[in-house]
Amino acid sequence: KRVAPPKVDVVGASDKITQNEKLNKRINILLLGIDDGDSDAAPDEPKRTDAMMLASFDPGDNKVALLSLPRDTKVQIPGRAGWDKLNAAYAYGGVMMAKQTVANLLQVPIHYYVLVDWRAFIDVIDLIGGVDLYVEKDMYYEDPYADLVIDIKHGYQHLDGKRAGEYVRFRKDELGDIGRVQRQQKFMKAAAAQIFNIDTVTKIPALFSTVDRHVETDMNTLTMIKAANSFKLFGDEKVKSGMLYGNFDDTEGISYWATSREEVQKSLDEIGIPYMKDDEDEQE
């Protein structure tokens, strides 16, 4: 069942209580992106996640950590035999299955989720007036079946919502999905810096209200505002990002991003996300 985020009123600029609301403990949020226009999937086929990221807010150290999870990551999905790709978890069991699969992979508790389709992404970027970004190379891709043409030039660009969506979804180069994950990280940091530099945090609830048709979450209004306030107070210099370490693996005839327990722990250690240690797991 689709659950839209709670309707929120735009808080008046004089409402210091709302503006001062902050998190008092770490929370981990699983961010999932769904592409309803993905031509890789049949119209009646369950949707797979097009992007997955763990956002960890630590009010103790005033830091935010973002860990990108390649959609082809080789995982075991609860209740299924053998190996699957991480992006299949949502198709098999919805948000709860995706949360459990990521929690098992990382040995990290997932407190909340935010599921966004690309329409919401485009709307948010347009609402903040677009994002300035240095595009690392020319990008061109054409998919007539999806009525999609990506044509972004190398150099400094001002990306509106549509072109920003094309930038973060482009994967037709030598790095494939891994290159796309790297671009998503780069773009998110640039967009976050712009969003949370908006003069007043009271615009954040308005963003949620505007895109609520395209967003599903189990966070309540106050928690969303606290997370937004914390992000604004931390500043983009306190945002650390990384990608799940691993390597390409096609030994079984399927292209996976294979990772090990050691690589998972290294990924989390480098950006400061705590996880369950192996000895703690054994004691239980």
For the regions a language model picked out, list residue spans one by one.
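Non-catalytic, solvent-exposed segments at the cell envelope interface
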Residues: 1-284
